[in-house]
Regions:
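Short, leucine-enriched amphipathic alpha-helices that occur as contiguous helical runs
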Residues: 20, 37-38
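Short, Lys/Arg-enriched N-terminal segment that forms or immediately precedes the first helix
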Residues: 18-31
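Non-DNA-binding regulatory cores of transcription-related proteins
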Residues: 82-157
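A short acidic, leucine-rich amphipathic alpha-helix
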Residues: 56-62, 73
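Short capping segments at the starts of secondary-structure elements
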Residues: 36, 47-53
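Basic amphipathic alpha-helical segments that dock to polyanions
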Residues: 73-83
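Pre-recognition alpha-helix immediately N-terminal to the DNA-recognition helix
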Residues: 39-44
Length: 157
């Protein structure tokens, strides 16, 4: 029997202070000052475990009393993505979503409800094993992969 672990809907774990420190150090190492909007976006990303759109990150910043423009959020996301500090996730609805790229390579995949639009993270060790088995079979080196399963969540079924 296969074990799949998924976060309950709307339940997020923080990305960890390790990622936040790593992101700030990477910005400093390449000469970017980590002020204002960059600090706010990094803090918002560090407080999530699953992907969020620029608009959702902007709303999260505003909800915690931070003030920055949406254009600054987009610029910061572009910078962080260019430094491989965040992963861009395409869930198929035309909205780019972002999440921390953990320095240790830890990652998860996504379940997307086509009815309500909810996105839920899941991890399945058997799936990871199968991906690497296929790669070995066809003599291919996998550097990264994204799995997005689309369908209907428990609430919408």
């Amino acid at each position: 029997m296969q074990t799949v672990s998924a976060s309950p809907p709307h339940h997020h774990h923080s990305a960890s202070p390790v990622w936040e420190a790593h992101a700030r150090a990477a910005l400093a190492a390449q000469g970017s000052r980590a002020g204002g909007a960059r600090q706010l976006v990094i803090a918002a990303l560090a407080g999530q475990d699953c992907c969020a759109s620029a608009q959702e990150i902007h709303a999260r910043i505003a909800a915690t009393g931070g003030t920055t423009g949406i254009a600054s959020v987009y610029r910061t996301l572009d910078l962080l993505h260019g430094l491989s500090l965040i992963t861009r996730i395409d869930t198929g609805d035309g909205v780019a979503r972002f999440e921390p790229a953990h320095p240790d390579g830890a990652h998860h995949h996504h379940l997307v409800c086509d009815t309500c639009g909810s996105v839920e993270a899941f991890h399945d060790e058997a799936l990871e094993t199968a991906i690497h088995a296929v790669a070995d079979h066809v003599d291919f080196r996998v550097d990264a992969h994204d799995i997005v399963l689309r369908g209907a969540c428990r609430t919408c079924r």
